[in-house]
């Protein structure tokens, strides 16, 4: 036998051994999965599902609970009779395929069986949970019924023990208690006949109604007290106040009808009681709030009339005296105006105003007569009378204020005249002082614009003296002249100061610059121009500027230094 044949035989044997090992391994894996399926099937089949269902059957469920139970029971019957058999068949088929070395088909069959058993396990778990919920619901109903009944019994006892606190509402409370009791009876019937789910819903409703009724009963006594005691007492007090109001001969405004308002309050009280019997607590609270507002509104009307009466009695008694006082003031003011106009011209129409006040006083006097007549006759509400009295008093106060203002103006005329006279005399004295001050400077002459300013200011002051010397003085004209003269004097003083300062400084700077005149032609020419401006043109400002620029050419800062020394040592002029 050749070596090639031997090699082929060895290779073939190796392949056969490898295939056999692979077949054994695949068969073993599939067999393990089949065994696992068998164990899961047995575990699922051993669950006490049937026992749990049988125990629920003994509960004899009806209604909604029975419908739910039938669905779970039918699902279990389908699983136990059909699904388990089908699963057995698939597992058996997988075993046959595995034993005959149809590995791939066997694996597919095992996978299908695994998917099927997973669904079955989920279905069984759902069935058990659904059945357990029915049992648990029954237990909850059994536990909760006593708690709910205790709530109901306590509520019924509280209502019975405190029936006097609920007034006429007790009948409605008893109706609600009867309805709740009917709901509990319905629950017992449903629960005992095997419908725990529907019974639980009825029990929940009964408990909610019990809690709601408890909340209502806690609020009712307060409302009963308010409706049956507090509000009637307030209405009684209000009626007494109204009777007293009428007895004291008060008159109400036309838009206030006490009887209608009292009837309206009683209607709201009846409505509150009716709403309380219907357990409309929010509306009851709103009605009571409205009653409170209306009661307070009536008291406010009474208080307004009482307050108005006090005001009328206090002020009306002095109205005539006040008018006579203002009338006397007016008469005296007219006399004062006639006296003042002998010496002064009045431009404020003071006399016209005072005559207008006199006419207004006559009108107010007529109003006061009418007001006093209404007070005596008691035919008008005090609130209206009070407004009319206040209107008259305010008008009289305004007239008096204006009278005082005019009187102060007349009295101040003499003071204004005296002040203007003093100012005129002071300005006249200052003008003479300025004239002497300028003359002492020994200037070659004065600029025309300065002379014009000086003489114009003098004319202003003389005009002021002229106006002050008239037989009848116009104080407005005098005050205007005082203002204009004051401004002119201010400008003249500034112009005088600038003129004399620049004249003196120009002379000093020219003298200082002479030391450079012989050696510097520009300085000599600058001095010549400065002297020309000073002596011939009488332009002292120009002369000062010219010599200052000239000195800067040969000695920078000299002009500023000399000016600084001058202003530091310069005495204050007498006119300042």
Swiss-Prot record:
<keyword id="KW-0717">Septation</keyword>
<feature type="coiled-coil region">
    <location>
        <begin position="105"/>
        <end position="134"/>
    </location>
</feature>
<keyword id="KW-0175">Coiled coil</keyword>
<feature type="coiled-coil region">
    <location>
        <begin position="277"/>
        <end position="301"/>
    </location>
</feature>
<comment type="function">
    <text>Negative regulator of FtsZ ring formation; modulates the frequency and position of FtsZ ring formation. Inhibits FtsZ ring formation at polar sites. Interacts either with FtsZ or with one of its binding partners to promote depolymerization.</text>
</comment>
<dbReference type="Pfam" id="PF06160">
    <property type="entry name" value="EzrA"/>
</dbReference>
<dbReference type="GO" id="GO:0005886">
    <property type="term" value="C:plasma membrane"/>
</dbReference>
<dbReference type="GO" id="GO:0000921">
    <property type="term" value="P:septin ring assembly"/>
</dbReference>
<keyword id="KW-0472">Membrane</keyword>
<feature type="topological domain" description="Extracellular">
    <location>
        <begin position="1"/>
        <end position="7"/>
    </location>
</feature>
<comment type="similarity">
    <text>Belongs to the EzrA family.</text>
</comment>
<keyword id="KW-1133">Transmembrane helix</keyword>
<keyword id="KW-0812">Transmembrane</keyword>
<dbReference type="InterPro" id="IPR010379">
    <property type="entry name" value="EzrA"/>
</dbReference>
<dbReference type="GO" id="GO:0005940">
    <property type="term" value="C:septin ring"/>
</dbReference>
<keyword id="KW-0131">Cell cycle</keyword>
<keyword id="KW-1003">Cell membrane</keyword>
<feature type="transmembrane region" description="Helical">
    <location>
        <begin position="8"/>
        <end position="26"/>
    </location>
</feature>
<dbReference type="GO" id="GO:0000917">
    <property type="term" value="P:division septum assembly"/>
</dbReference>
<feature type="topological domain" description="Cytoplasmic">
    <location>
        <begin position="27"/>
        <end position="576"/>
    </location>
</feature>
<keyword id="KW-0132">Cell division</keyword>
<protein>
    <recommendedName>
        <fullName>Septation ring formation regulator EzrA</fullName>
    </recommendedName>
</protein>
């Amino acid at each position: 036998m050749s070596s090639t044949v031997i090699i082929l035989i060895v290779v073939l044997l190796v392949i056969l051994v490898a295939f056999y090992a692979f077949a054994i391994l695949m068969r073993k894996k599939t067999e393990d999965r089949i065994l696992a399926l068998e164990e899961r099937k047995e575990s699922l089949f051993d669950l006490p599902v049937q026992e749990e269902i049988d125990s629920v059957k003994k509960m004899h469920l009806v209604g909604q609970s029975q419908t739910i139970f039938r669905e779970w029971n039918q699902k279990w019957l389908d699983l136990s009779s059909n699904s388990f058999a089908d699963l057995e068949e698939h597992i058996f088929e997988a075993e046959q395929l595995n034993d005959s070395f149809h590995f791939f088909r066997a694996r597919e069959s095992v996978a299908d069986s695994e998917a099927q058993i997973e669904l079955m396990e989920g279905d069984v778990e759902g069935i058990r949970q659904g059945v357990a919920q029915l049992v648990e619901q029954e237990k909850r109903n059994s536990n909760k019924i006593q708690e709910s009944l205790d709530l109901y019994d306590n509520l019924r006892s509280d209502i019975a023990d405190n029936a006097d606190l609920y007034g006429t509402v007790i009948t409605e409370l008893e109706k609600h208690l009867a309805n709740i009791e009917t709901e509990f009876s319905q629950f017992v019937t449903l629960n005992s006949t095997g419908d725990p789910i529907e019974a639980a819903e009825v029990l929940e409703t009964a408990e909610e109604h019990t809690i709601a009724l408890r909340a209502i009963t806690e609020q009712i006594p307060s409302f009963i007290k308010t409706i049956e005691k507090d509000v009637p007492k307030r209405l009684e007090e209000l009626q007494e106040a109204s009777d007293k109001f009428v007895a004291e001969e008060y008159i109400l405004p036309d838009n206030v009808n006490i009887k209608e308002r009292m009837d309206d309050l009683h209607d709201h009280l009846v409505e509150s009681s009716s709403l309380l019997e219907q357990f409309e607590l929010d509306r009851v609270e709103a009605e009571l709030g409205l009653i409170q507002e209306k009661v307070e509104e009536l008291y406010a009307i009474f208080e307004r009339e009482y307050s108005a009466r006090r005001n009328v009695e206090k002020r009306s008694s002095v109205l005539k005296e006040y008018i006579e006082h203002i009338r006397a003031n007016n008469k005296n003011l007219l006399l004062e105006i006639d006296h003042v106009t002998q010496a002064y011209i009045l431009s404020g129409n003071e006399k016209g105003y005072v005559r207008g006040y006199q006419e207004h006083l006559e009108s107010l006097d007529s109003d006061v007569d009418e007001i006093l007549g209404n007070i005596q006759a008691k035919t008008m509400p005090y609130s209206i009378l009070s407004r009319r009295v206040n209107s008259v008093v305010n008008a009289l106060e305004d007239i008096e204020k204006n009278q005082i203002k005019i009187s102060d103006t007349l009295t101040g005329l003499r003071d204004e005249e005296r002040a203007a006279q003093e100012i005129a005399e002071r300005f006249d004295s200052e003008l003479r002082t300025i004239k002497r001050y300028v003359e002492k400077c020994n200037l070659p002459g004065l600029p025309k614009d300065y002379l014009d300013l000086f003489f114009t200011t003098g004319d202003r002051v003389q005009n002021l003296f002229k106006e002050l010397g008239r037989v009848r003085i116009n104080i407005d004209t005098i005050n205007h002249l005082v203002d204009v003269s004051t401004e002119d004097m201010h400008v003249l003083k500034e112009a005088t100061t600038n003129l004399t300062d620049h004249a003196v400084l120009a002379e000093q700077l020219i003298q200082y610059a002479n030391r450079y005149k012989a050696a510097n032609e520009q300085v000599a020419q600058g001095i010549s121009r400065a002297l020309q401006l000073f002596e011939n043109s009488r332009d002292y400002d120009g002369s000062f500027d010219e010599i200052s620029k000239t000195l800067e050419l040969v000695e920078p800062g000299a002009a500023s230094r000399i000016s600084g020394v001058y202003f530091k040592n310069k005495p204050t002029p007498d006119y300042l």
